[in-house]
Amino acid sequence: STKRSNLETESNSLNSKLITLRANLSNYKEEGTTIEEDIRDMKAEISRLTAKGCKNNEEISTCGRKYNSGNVTITATGWSYPLNWGCVTSEYTGYNIREDWSGGGGHHGIDLDCVSEGTTAYPAANGVVARIVNYSSCGGNQVWVYHNVNGIPYTTVYLHLLRISVSVDQVVTPQTKIGEVGGYSTQSYDNCTTGAHLHFGMAYGHNAYNFNANSFNPRNIINFPALYYSGGGYFSR
């Protein structure tokens, strides 16, 4: 079937990436999900969409758009900050002083700080929750949201959450509580954080399972202030 063929292709690609990542593990640590988590969640997604009515001859992306959020088309015309207030302490692809990277590595988002643990995090635009990961070793509790802003599909991700307040397929707005910012109390399982902050990332398309390859600097779309440690100020909704 088309779905099974897609899954096998993705699994082969992810397994190949796993070999490469393990070979270079001493050089960097990738923030987000592990390859094993991606494969596990993709299989669960196939089962979930099949149970909702996706047919064997349908593309995963097509039937996903059809059945996610109860056939409701979620659109938006603009973006909001994912926190009511905060500052930027780490740039997209920049070295992150709050995360443990052995020798560096890519940073596929920006870090929003100057807030305390437990601060409410919000979606950056109207959308639907596409994926949730709990207790990942490098990213902790994570939420992916699919958007369609001005006719363009996007994915946003929110990492290092203390708690998650939404569920997969839930329709959200910029006023919906996604969860709470994590911090020192999440370090027991999240090896990539040393303090309270929200990692916020953006990518083109609906790519909860291939996010980093399609990611871009959130500053390209949302007007965040300069780095706090370089004299930048605060943002607020």
Regions found by a protein language model. Name each.
Residues 72-79, 84, 167-174, 180, ...:
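Acidic, glycine-rich catalytic/binding loops that coordinate metals and/or anionic ligands
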Residues 128, 152, 170-171, 176:
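Residue-level signal for well-ordered, solvent-exposed loop/turn and beta-edge residues enriched
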Residues 111, 144, 157, 180, ...:
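Conserved beta-strand positions that form and line the central face of beta-propeller blades
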